């Protein structure tokens, strides 16, 4: 798992749009805050790390099926269960739409900072466990 920033994120955006017609941005919003990290590994067995040059749109395109976008959520609240029951999770609309579009290539990693507990979930897992859902938009005008 690694963090990509700046031009690397823009190149990833270009590769998804060019090869899969998946837009990682909404309107003019190009900040790509809908994910924090990428995991680069073969999705088919044997699952192993894949080296991808994120400065090259072509290399990213060639390896898109091996890239999983990861959104990390963390908390140190003591009232959260070990399996993250009772966790009120902020989930942006962009994160949700991207997770749905990418299916199994988008994951949420939940981290309890105090306990060191970490779990990985798909968007379907989150919805299956959701007690309440409140979606909202936060918009900054020019």
Predicted segments with their positions:
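Mg2+/Mn2+-dependent nuclease catalytic core
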Residues: 76-101
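A short acidic (Asp/Glu
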Residues: 49, 81-83, 120
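Acidic-basic catalytic patches of nuclease active cores, encompassing PD-(D/E)XK
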Residues: 1-33
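Short mixed-charge
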Residues: 37, 43-63
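A structural signal for short secondary-structure junctions
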Residues: 30-31, 62-65, 100-104
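Conserved catalytic cores of phosphodiester-cleaving nucleases, focusing on short active-site segments
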Residues: 36-39, 48, 66-78
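Domain-level recognition of nuclease-like catalytic cores that cleave nucleotide substrates
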Residues: 97-142
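Residues immediately flanking
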Residues: 72-74, 93, 113
């Amino acid at each position: 798992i690694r963090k990509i920033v700046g031009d690397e994120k823009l190149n990833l955006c270009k590769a998804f749009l060019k090869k899969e017609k998946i837009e990682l941005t909404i309107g003019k919003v190009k900040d790509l805050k809908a994910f924090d990290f990428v995991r680069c590994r073969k999705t088919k067995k044997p699952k192993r790390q894949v080296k991808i040059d994120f400065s090259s749109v072509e290399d990213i395109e060639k390896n898109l099926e091996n890239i999983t976008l990861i959104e990390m959520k963390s908390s140190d609240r003591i009232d959260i269960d070990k399996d993250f029951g009772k966790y009120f999770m902020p989930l942006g609309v962009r994160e949700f739409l991207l997770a749905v579009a990418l299916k199994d290539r988008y994951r949420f990693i939940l981290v309890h900072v105090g306990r060191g507990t970490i779990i990985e979930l798909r968007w379907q897992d989150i919805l299956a466990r959701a007690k309440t859902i409140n979606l909202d938009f936060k918009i900054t005008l020019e």
